[in-house]
Structure formats: structure tokens, C-alpha cells
Amino acid sequence: MKGGETMSVRRSGYKAVVDGVGGRRRREDDMVEIRKAKREESLLKKRREALPHSPSADSLDQKLISCIWSDERDLLIEATTQIRTLLCGEMFNVRVEEVIQAGLVPRFVEFLTWDDSPQLQFEAAWALTNIASGTSENTEVVIDHGAVAILVRLLNSPYDVVREQVVWALGNISGDSPRCRDIVLGHAALPSLLLQLNHGAKLSMLVNAAWTLSNLCRGKPQPPFDQVSAALPALAQLIRLDDKELLAYTCWALVYLSDGSNEKIQAVIEANVCARLIGLSIHRSPSVITPALRTIGNIVTGNDSQTQHIIDLQALPCLVNLLRGSYNKTIRKEACWTVSNITAGCQSQIQAVFDADICPALVNLLQNSEGDVKKEAAWAICNAIAGGSYKQIMFLVKQECIKPLCDLLTCSDTQLVMVCLEALKKILKVGEVFSSRHAEGIYQCPQTNVNPHAQLIEEAEGLEKIEGLQSHENNDIYETAVKILETYWMEEEEEEDQEQQDMIYFPVDNFANMPTSSGTLSEMHCGP
């Protein structure tokens, strides 16, 4: 498998690679289900609902539109509030198009500049917030009318309610796409946003600011790290608070900041957030557990030293809890992925996983869990086999990992088949040593000429599955299967054939009368 096309493709996503099939793996785009799931869509854009008893209108009629162009301040505030309320209610998609078609967006942007009317600024910012929460086309309208620069300026408003609403508006704009995010960053929004996270800020401001920060840090292509890493000190303070929503947004920001090079990972480590992240990985709320766990998972894709930092902070007992508990599929999958990157490390790190009693939980998931979870559990075990010592591999065999690995040889995921095949090959190699005279004293087992791991694979119906892979369309899988069969079973078949030949005999009484080309043996033996 080394040097093969399959592994070269897989390795392109690694942070580091160990010999064999294993290696630390960055999260692949097709693995990131939660980024496409509905529960995270709420992170990207949020529409603010109407306050109780807000003045409202039944529809956007011409009279209401004309009021927006009035010179009377009180009438402007009332009309803007009514339109904003329409944008908070039902039929949002219809209402936002009506507002845009009526040409009201540039008027709302103009109201943002009226510093002598903070109430009008607030209502206009709220209306723009909800417009930007719509489609990408809706967001583009807000951007195209110059709202971003003015919103960033309003982060310095003396009025808390205005600043908080502006933070929300910028969060919706930056959450639309990487291009919109970069426009907001390009207007130097981040430094002013970080100023909102002071000790006197209300919880609602902290929550909104953390959410907007997460949107400024997310997306592919990623934002310039030297720009967004300025948020790390603030995030390190926010993560020490207790509000569930605030913690979730803060952890998501850390997910995005830790997703990348070892230099990025090191910056997150140096922000002193890892111990708190590990504690949050067993939080009561899945909305906090998921991003906390994913950040930990990102960190252990780094080098051995960075991975060891997480181990030293006692992450493994938390991971055992997540693997054994009744958590949702996403959390169990994330936990397995995290462990797989730890078992891709050095042998002492593999041993730390063993000592934490994680292997039984992995084997259980490998046998009984859903496909995605099973795949990550397989990677965790196969990485340990790839980089483990013979003694460590023997330990995994005793944990009964062979049968579930054999069962995966028939799955449709060619990368996973290859990984399991390589793991079984390593197991067979260890079994060969085990059966040789050199094994005596190492495993303290009786000497035998039989490869016990080959027997276990046969009992698990693995031999017939490996034989079936000789017709696999993937050339690497085919070649590896053939090599395994030639190395560990062909010789056995030859020995059996020889034994059968040795069993052919003639009765002793008739031996002298055995016919030959020159007569019987007795005749050939008689002399003159």
C-alpha cells in the first residue's frame, strides 16, 4: 500500500503520516455532515423576531412606503418600525422582496448615518439585519448599498442597543459566504467587534458577538489567520463563562481557528483553552459537546507534541465516556475520529489509549454502530495496528478486533477496505512471528508452527473475503489481497498437498508384487 495511488490520495489530507496505512487525518469535506445539517444552519444567519406590542402593519402598502420618505422624524421611526415588524413575521420571503423592490434598502442604510436619532438607527439596523438573513441575493443588496462600512462605524456608537443590533447585522452578512465574510473583515470590523467583549457587556451582546466572531472565522477558503487569530484572547475569556449558547458559539470559532496547519493549532494551544475544551466535551448539552470535541479533534491532527498536550490534560477519560455513552451519532463519530488521530501517533500515545480502556468501546462500535461511526472506529484501530508494537497488536487481537475488520472487507468504501486489509496483513505478520521459535519468551506462549492469527481470520470468514478481493476493481486492493494469500495461505496449501501425496501407499504384503516396466519388484530382486 505504501506509495499506492489510494494511499497517496488519502495522505493528501493528512497532517502527519506514520508508516503503513495509518496517519493523522484532517477532517475531509465529505465527512463534515454537521456543516450541512439544519442544526448548524442557525449558526450562519439569524433573523430577529419582533418584540411584543411592536407597531405593525398588515402589508407593505404605498402609504407606508411614502412615510419612509417623510421629513417628520417621529413618522420615520414609526414607519421603519412597522416595516421591520413585517420582516419579522410570516411570509418573510415575500416581504423582503417587497421591501427591496420598493427601494427601501438604501433609505435604511441612510438612516444608519443619522447619529442624532439612535432609535431610527436601531430600527434601520434591525430591518437590514433581517434582510441580510435571507438569500445570498438579499445579502448582496445590503452590501451593494454600502451598509458594511457604516455598520462597522456604528460599532463605536455610544448606545448599547445600536451596537448590539449592528453586531447581529454584521454576523448575518459575514455568515452568507466567504466573499461576504472577507468584505466585513476588509472593513476592519474585527478590532471594533472585539471591543464589545468588555466586562460590562450584557450577556446578549456577548452571545451575539461570539456568534459573529464564529462567522468571521469560518468558511473555505479560510480567512487570513494572522487577521482572525486576534480573536483568540477574547475567545479564551468567553470560554470560561457558563452560558450554553455563548459556549457553543465560542467553541465553533475555535473549531474554525484550529482547522489547519500545526502553526494554527499551536496558536490555539497557546491561548490556554485546551483544558476548558476537554471539560466541555462532557457538557450536558450536545450543542456544546460537538464543537468542543471537534476542536480537540483538530488539535490532535497536529504533531506528536501537540497531541501529547491533549493527552496530558486527561482527554482520554472524557473520550471513553463519549464512546460508551448514549450520545448521538455525530458525537460518537467525532470521538472515534479524535481517537484515530491519537492512535496515529507514537507507540506511547497508542499505549495511553489502551491504558484508558478505550479499545473495548472501539471494538463494540466497530461491531454494532452505524456506518459512519464504524468507519471512524476502524480507522482508530487500524492506525494503532499500523504504528503499534507487536505486543500492542497482540493486545488488539485479544480484544477481538479481527472479526469486525474482516466484515468490513466487503464494504463499498475502497479506502476503508484497503485500510482493513493492511491491518490484517500486519496482524498476520505478528502471528507469523508468534508461531516461530523467536516468539518464545516474548509472548510467553508455547511454540507452534501454526499462525494463530491466520486461524482466527479463517474462523471469522476472512479468508474467503480476502479471496474474493482478488477480483476487486481497485488494483491496490487486488494486489494486496493476492500478496496476503501467497504469503500466508499458499504455502499452507502446498504443505497440505504434500501431506496428501505422502499418504498414498501400497499394502506391505503386496509390495513385492508391485508391477514395474521390467517385471515385479520381487523378480527384479532375484539374483542368479
UniProtKB/Swiss-Prot annotation:
Pfam family name, one: Arm_3
GO biological process: one example: protein import into nucleus
SMART domains attached to this UniProt entry: ARM
Protein name: Importin subunit alpha-7
SUPFAM superfamilies assigned: ARM repeat (SSF48371)
UniProt key word Phosphoprotein: no
The UniProt record lists the keyword Transmembrane: no
ARM repeat residue intervals: 93-133, 136-175, 178-218, 220-259, 262-301, 304-344, 347-386, 390-429
Keywords, alphabetical: Nucleus, Protein transport, Repeat, Transport
Free-text function comment from the UniProt entry: Binds to conventional NLS motifs and mediates nuclear protein import across the nuclear envelope. Acts as a cellular receptor for the nuclear import of the virD2 protein of Agrobacterium, but is not essential for Agrobacterium-mediated root transformation.
One GO cellular component, as annotated: nuclear envelope
Single annotated GO MF: nuclear import signal receptor activity
Start and end residues of each IBB domain: 1-56
Location of the protein in the cell: Nucleus envelope
The protein's assembly and partners: Forms a complex with importin subunit beta-1.
Primary localization class, coarse: nucleus
Family: Belongs to the importin alpha family.
Domain of life: Eukaryota
